[in-house]
């Protein structure tokens, strides 16, 4: 096909996909009866066609893009100016849609209002709102009776799975993207006019290449495993807690010794959960900070409004120095902090132990504050030997007499994530960067700044979830996805299929 030009609608030439006739009728899903369009607005595309958009990753960020695109196409379906729909595809490494499956702890709740779902802030009338999900599943009144804005985490993941199921025809699951490379230079313009996305089917190893004018990289963060921790099956990142620990420690009544490293929400949740999951186990929470610190979630502008979509504009327009100062000042809203009610529960548990055993060394559950794990070894019994180093701060240690040794059957690292996975996937794109000394710099609309002398204006790459330094603390959070998804749709496809506002 001819992939060198675009239609007036911003879609590639070639086989046209007419806007489907809208027709609603009942459809049964794996969870419960629902209503869905019998003819998707976004039909499947064969691998050998030039795509208008390929999204690398199909987590919440890419799902929000799919929803925003669907909603806008629905609004323009009867417009005489829209005669074709974009050709898009999502490539996802996981076997199905999943959101933090390793941290779906029993009883855990969301930390943001359900109103900040994948659609409501952008369009409360969208069929993809959390409230519509509840209505479809006949739970709207039941949820209302809970009197809360914070759904159970397991329910919110089910909501997102329900949304994702509407786009199943567009997603290639169990597909790992290997790299994104520039196309051959167009002989007429002398510029790159599309990109090649190379991926591998995990089950068979089959490698497939697809071509796209626009590529969104939204692969989320990689577990951060500090260098001092060796590769060991008994050392688990918090992201795999629920999916890995039960098989590793399969006797819930055994007197295990389990350590957790970290001082944020995940560390506190796991420490608290272990005491119920393994009632006879000894648990230890090890952290560099001197205490668990409460998150600041006041509704006033200085705190919660930091995560409002419009704050992204304000943050982006600041100088680099101002941005860095802002991030450091407001770190307590998102990093190494714990919701106050969980801190209170943990403190109450510690206090009961103090009543029973004045000697803290006799406690079943302990918190080792102002400590770091300096070394990890394993013995013949396969237990981990942890060397703890007490410290005044993160970098200044006390004398050796304050060091301790600890044995553990498992160590869970709640050490956060690194968000640089895009760099390896886009390694071949680096020579095309507009300002190589600035690294992977993106514009306000998340478009990677590429050299206009080398890359056609109608081709581009967008980065998601790795732009905190330029777009603020909300960049990796759910709070702004509804609006951001529409911004990406607008940036790629233009005003004719914008956010509809």
From Swiss-Prot:
Give the EC number: 1.14.13.196
Here the segments flagged for biased composition (Polar residues) are 26-37
**GO MF:** ornithine N5-monooxygenase activity
Induction per UniProt is:
Expression is under the control of the iron acquisition regulator hapX.
- So where does FAD get bound? 92-100, 111, 177, 476-478
Which keywords does this Swiss-Prot/TrEMBL entry list?
FAD, Flavoprotein, Monooxygenase, NADP, Oxidoreductase
Q: Mention any Pfam family matching this sequence.
A: Lys_Orn_oxgnase
Q: Supply the InterPro entries for this chain.
A: FAD/NAD-bd_sf, Lys/Orn_oxygenase
What name is this protein filed under? L-ornithine N(5)-monooxygenase
What organism is recorded for this protein? Answer: Arthroderma benhamiae (strain ATCC MYA-4681 / CBS 112371) (Trichophyton mentagrophytes)
């Amino acid at each position: 096909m001819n992939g060198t030009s675009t239609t007036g609608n911003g879609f590639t030439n070639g086989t046209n996909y007419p806007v489907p006739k809208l027709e609603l009728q009942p459809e049964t899903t794996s969870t419960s009866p629902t209503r869905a369009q019998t003819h998707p607005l976004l039909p499947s595309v064969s691998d050998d066609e030039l795509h208008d958009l390929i999204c690398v990753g199909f987590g919440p960020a890419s799902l929000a893009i799919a929803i925003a695109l669907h909603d806008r196409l629905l609004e323009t379906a009867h417009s005489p100016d829209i005669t074709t729909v974009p050709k898009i595809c999502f490539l996802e490494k996981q076997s199905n849609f999943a959101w933090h499956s390793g941290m779906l702890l029993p009883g855990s709740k969301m930390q943001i209002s359900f109103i900040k779902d994948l659609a409501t802030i952008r369009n409360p009338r969208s069929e993809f709102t959390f409230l519509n999900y509840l209505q479809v599943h006949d739970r709207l009144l039941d949820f209302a009776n809970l009197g809360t804005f914070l759904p159970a985490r397991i329910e919110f993941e089910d909501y997102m799975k329900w949304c994702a199921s509407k786009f199943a025809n567009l997603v290639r699951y169990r597909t790992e993207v290997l790299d994104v490379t520039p196309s051959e230079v167009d002989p007429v313009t002398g510029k790159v006019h599309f990109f090649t996305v190379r991926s591998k089917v995990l089950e068979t190893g089959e490698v497939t290449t697809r071509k796209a004018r626009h590529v969104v990289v939204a692969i989320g963060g990689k577990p951060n495993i500090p260098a001092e921790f060796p590769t060991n099956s008994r050392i688990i990142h918090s992201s795999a807690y629920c999916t890995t620990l039960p098989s590793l420690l399969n006797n819930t009544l055994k007197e295990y010794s389990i350590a957790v490293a970290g001082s944020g929400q995940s560390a506190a949740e796991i420490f608290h959960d272990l005491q119920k999951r393994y009632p006879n186990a000894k648990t230890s929470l090890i952290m560099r900070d001197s205490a668990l610190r409460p998150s600041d979630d006041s509704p006033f502008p200085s705190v919660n409004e930091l995560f409002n979509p419009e704050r992204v504009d304000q943050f982006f327009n600041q100088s680099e120095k101002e941005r860095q100062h802002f991030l450091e000042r407001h770190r307590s809203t998102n990093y190494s902090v714990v919701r106050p009610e969980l801190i209170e529960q943990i403190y109450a548990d510690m206090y009961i132990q103090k009543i029973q055993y004045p000697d803290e060394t006799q406690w079943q559950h302990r918190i080792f504050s102002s400590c770091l794990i300096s070394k990890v070894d394993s013995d013949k019994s396969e237990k981990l030997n942890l060397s703890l180093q007490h410290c005044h701060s993160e970098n200044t240690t006390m004398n050796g007499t304050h060091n301790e040794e600890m044995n553990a059957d498992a160590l869970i690292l709640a050490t956060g994530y690194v968000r640089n996975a895009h760099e390896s996937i886009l390694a071949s794109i680096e020579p095309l960067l507009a300002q190589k000394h600035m690294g992977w710099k993106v514009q306000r609309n998340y478009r990677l700044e590429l050299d206009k002398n080398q890359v056609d204006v109608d081709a581009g790459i967008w980065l998601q979830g790795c732009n905190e330094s330029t777009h603020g603390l909300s960049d990796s959070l759910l709070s702004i996805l509804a609006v951001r998804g529409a911004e990406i749709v607008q940036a790629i496809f233009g005003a004719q299929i914008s956010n509809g506002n």
